[in-house]
UniProtKB/Swiss-Prot annotation:
The gene is hemH. Belongs to the ferrochelatase family. One of its GO terms (cellular component) is cytoplasm. PANTHER family: FERROCHELATASE, FERROCHELATASE, MITOCHONDRIAL. Keywords: Cytoplasm, Heme biosynthesis, Iron, Lyase, Metal-binding, Porphyrin biosynthesis. Signal peptide: none annotated. This is Ferrochelatase.
Length: 322
């Protein structure tokens, strides 16, 4: 019997898997006009090349410190494998990275080779922004338009308030809090990837969705002190405030001694968790007098999180046909 299968396309940012890949990865990132507009469109690839060359040495050193490359591809492929097990034989899962390999065109070619034309494109960014999910879906549409295959695509654009996503976050936080003698002494610092304020001013829903996630999580942790901040700022423009560095300084100044970091916009470990939080922010916090600095484990292939993805794929309420 021939099984009518659906391809699940997991859309993720991607990351350089070697030191040599850092500069071309950065070049791809800074060439994307959905995330940053540098001069006229025809000049952006050249400017992106110059920026990537200038930044690559510093960024490469950060990747060297976490093992020589990003684990994001491996972790996303593990998520794809676990999701395929949960979904069963009617589904095949593929990975499409926005700025590295396998890129969207490679992923769609693999779908074609598998003989599948129906796709559920699932963004692994829980919170929608035109700079993240929006960019990935735009790239998918460009690649699809060039293909001779008549794909039928359903897009899952966000899941910031999905009950299983909230439960999976709460599970990780609960595990971390159980390691303290008195959780009431702990301050939770939810840290999300930053975004230029201009995106929010133009109607991007990212900030509202981040706040909604935090509010839903905190319904289950009444009495625990919590805060929200934004990391990974780049460039001279105004970004969402407060920055994570600023909030850590503020909390240290208030005498906070136990700080538990909760990465809220990342579903897998990568440079922002393994270096920025685990190394950079840890060092700054300890220098400022915070005595106990910890981070909640990332979702990665948490069974609860994989169940969330499976429910979304099977036709949750965040889908639309394109």
């Amino acid at each position: 019997m021939v099984i009518d299968r659906t391809a699940v396309l997991l859309l993720q940012m991607g990351g350089p898997d070697s030191i040599e890949a850092v500069e071309p990865f950065l070049r791809n990132l800074f060439s994307d006009r959905d995330i940053i507009r540098i001069g006229p469109a025809f000049l952006q690839p050249l400017i992106a090349r110059l920026i990537a060359r200038r930044r690559s040495k510093r960024v490469a050193e950060q990747y060297r410190q976490i093992g020589g490359g990003s684990p994001l591809r491996k972790l996303t492929e593990q998520q794809a494998a676990e999701l395929e097990k949960v979904l069963g034989e009617g589904y095949r899962c593929f990975v499409a990275m926005r700025y590295w390999k396998p890129d969207t065109s490679q992923a769609l070619e693999a779908v074609v080779q598998a003989g599948i034309t129906r796709i559920v494109a699932l963004s692994l960014y829980p919170h929608y922004s035109r700079a993240t999910s929006g960019s990935s879906f735009n790239e998918l549409e460009r690649v699809r338009a060039r293909s001779a295959t008549p794909f039928q695509v359903t897009c899952v654009r966000q899941f910031h308030d999905h009950p299983l996503y909230i439960t999976s976050l709460c599970d990780r936080i609960g595990q971390a809090l159980s390691g303290y003698a008195d959780p009431g002494d702990v301050h939770l610092l939810f840290t999300a990837h930053g975004l230029p304020q201009s995106f929010i001013d133009s109607g991007d829903p990212y900030l509202d969705q981040i706040r909604a996630t935090v509010a839903l999580v905190m319904e289950r942790f009444g009495g625990i002190n919590h805060h929200l901040a934004f990391q990974s700022r780049a460039g001279p423009v105004k970004w969402l405030e407060p920055s994570t560095e600023k909030k850590i300084r503020e909390l240290a100044g208030q005498g906070v001694k136990k700080l538990l970091m909760v990465p809220v916009s990342f579903v897998s470990d990568h440079i922002e968790t393994l270096h920025e939080i685990d190394m950079q922010y840890r060092h700054e916090a300890l220098e400022l007098g915070i005595e106990d600095f910890r981070r909640v484990e990332s979702l990665n292939s948490s069974p609860l999180f994989i169940d969330c993805l499976a429910e979304l794929v099977r036709g949750g309420d965040r889908t639309e046909e394109t």
